[in-house]
UniProtKB/Swiss-Prot annotation:
Motif residue range(s): HXXXXD motif: 230-235
Encoding gene per record: GPAM
Classification via PANTHER family: GLYCEROL-3-PHOSPHATE ACYLTRANSFERASE (PTHR12563), GLYCEROL-3-PHOSPHATE ACYLTRANSFERASE 1, MITOCHONDRIAL (PTHR12563:SF16)
Protein name: Glycerol-3-phosphate acyltransferase 1, mitochondrial
Positions of post-translational N6-acetyllysine modification: 777, 781
Enzyme class, broadest EC rank: transferase
Annotated compartments: Mitochondrion outer membrane
Amino acid sequence: MDESALTLGTIDVSYLPNSSEYSIGRCKHATEEWGECGSRPTVFRSATLKWKESLMSRKRPFVGRCCYSCTPQSWDKFFNPSIPSLGLRNVIYINETHTRHRGWLARRLSYVLFIQERDVHKGMFATNVTENVLNSSRVQEAIAEVAGELNPDGSAQQQSKAVNKVKKKARKILQEMVATVSPAMIRLTGWVLLKLFNSFFWNIQIHKGQLEMVKAATETNLPLIFLPVHRSHIDYLLLTFILFCHNIKAPYIASGNNLNIPIFSTLIHKLGGFFIRRRLDETPDGRKDILYRALLHGHIVELLRQQQFLEIFLEGTRSRSGKISCARAGLLSVVVDTLSTNTIPDILIIPGGISYDRIIEGHYNGEQLGKPKKNESLWSIARGVIRMLRKNYGCVKTDFAQPFSLKEYLESQSQKPVSAPLSLEQALLPAILPSRPSGAADEGTDMSINESRNATDESRRRLIAHLAEHILFTASKSCAIMSTHIVACLLLYRHRQGIGLFTLVEDFFVMKEEVLARDFDLGFSGNSEDVVMHAIQFLGNCITITHTSKNDEFFITPSTTIPSVFELNFYSNGVLHVFIMEAIIACSLYAVLKKRGPGGPASPSLVSQEQLVHKAASLCYLLSNEGTISLPCQTFYQICHETVGRFIQYGILIVAEQDDQEDISPGLAEQQWDKKLPEPLSWRSDEEDEDSDFGEEQRDCYLKVSQSKEHQQFITFLQRLLGPLLEAYSSAAVFIHNFGGPVPEPEFLQKLHKYLITRTERRVAVYAESATYCLVKNAVKTFKDIGVFKETKQKRVSGLELSNTFLPQCNRQKLLEYILSLVVL
């Protein structure tokens, strides 16, 4: 294989928009030329042939622009039309041209000279943090409160002793928390990482235009918050290394205290890392630790006050599924509070995407099979480094989204009408149990709790949750799609029974173009044959390659063992967010058609657009714990409506002729459709209803499904993408038919996971990857949100029992039927 196509020691022209060199290079390769490929059957080609540009004029999208609706001023800030054309740079490709020196010695010492010339010094970083935090008013109040609890009725002398005792405890906590950045250690680590990264990565690509935006943001003298996705332990070092190489101040990195281990913790502290508890409520009695919360809040405020940069992983932990997890916005709330108190004028938010051909951990099969997570230790880190040095992990693509003003975002949200979003229970129960009286609620559910909550606190919580969703959605849009993601996805959901190498290369090429057409970037370049072989090299443990003497071709088959399928699914999930909305429409289309069936209208191939959008929106709610599906400033109904419009544009759905629509009289179920769902679920606005010149029956239109082979294959592919998720949810619904309750939640998760694994081992499951532990946890969380389970707290363990609504067996059966209506097996 031609390594030059992938190592990218210099800028690869295939990354540059409208590159004539790129066009010529592609024309030389007959199998890559669009004109020749157009006559061959592939999974997506016909679905997008109407609107696809030719390969020669295809532009790489510039990803990561901020939300124009919520931050219109930031949209034009730090960005100019020349930014996207700046191209990519391989960060770990360093030679004498990157230094001020030339000659033989400069070539031999280029790494040392490059590191020495980086701008990093002590004055860049925070000083006197511990004392400033201890003397802050909030921490002083917390110390006095905790001391009062320790000595409620003591004398003044005893009270003074209690205060001193609490102060010592606070100082000890801060010693573990506060980082003491060492410029010398940053330089040394930069040199070591440059050597290490060159040994086990082929390249680390960044977009030079994105770095220009970050540099422009640093010149505002405002604190920056970097919020990247979390894929691997290497993430902690990767961002600091990239910023260091471009003379940008290293951020203070929030890290879980599971990494607070001897020697390694000292290194992390010297590089700007600070350790925080994974759970803030770690007092023996499970109460809020007032002192720790005050110290953490004071520490963040002090860093921001001194205009330091922060790096926070909103997901809280590495993604074990390959998908971006839901946000945990604890530290983000501290940042918002700091700005709300006018301590600093503004904060700039920078979401980030990180994509790997192969993560250094390789996979998370142990945890996905239900094995307990191993605690990190110095020995495990040493073994990991040794293992890394013996392998190659391919390419890395890091993206920095456009910085946006947190102050502007908060002000724009305050000007929007505040309305509480629908809970999953409010959104889905009317569809699952249509005969249930509206407004019915169980005793002991969250209804009474919500009513008693302070409205201001609830509004603040929603504001922070929406901000976190905004950031994660932008970060996911910024994540490049790697070659391993596409190959794993094709093998699992297009060619699960195996495929010839030549056909796999064709489908890879077309799927790559589909990714670009949806405004997602790629983390690779080169001709498709080389890139596919590159991906197969990293997925080798999960696939079987055989040589067929008949056609003299290699045949690629995904392995059927559970660990192999889990690993392929991990990498395949890297491309799921590209097609998630289209997959939701495809599954909803199946559900609507199946429901109408033989007893429906005269033309069962016609689908009500209104009905399809409602069904898709309810599926969005059902899958909302699988990650951020849309921006919070958009409703599910808006994006479902837009996606249906794209299906019409693709030609997959065809608007029926007026004569065909007039022949159809809506059935009773269709007439009552809106009555089964809460009023806010309409994707049309009140203004549209008032201004429309047409009746309700004329605003809805009917759609026909294209019967072409290519379109049907595309729909099937999309339905398979959600197959593992829906099979896991439906299997969980089957499992609760015999729920004995009450039961501790960890025990229930373990039993449900064992049930799913057993289904897979007995080959009952259609998708073996439906048995991953992540899907088990997400299914149970969704059932809690819907109101299937009531959650009880005993000491520090959560317990589960069926709610009053789902105690009747018939209602659990309706839940199962609702999920099964969406499942395509």
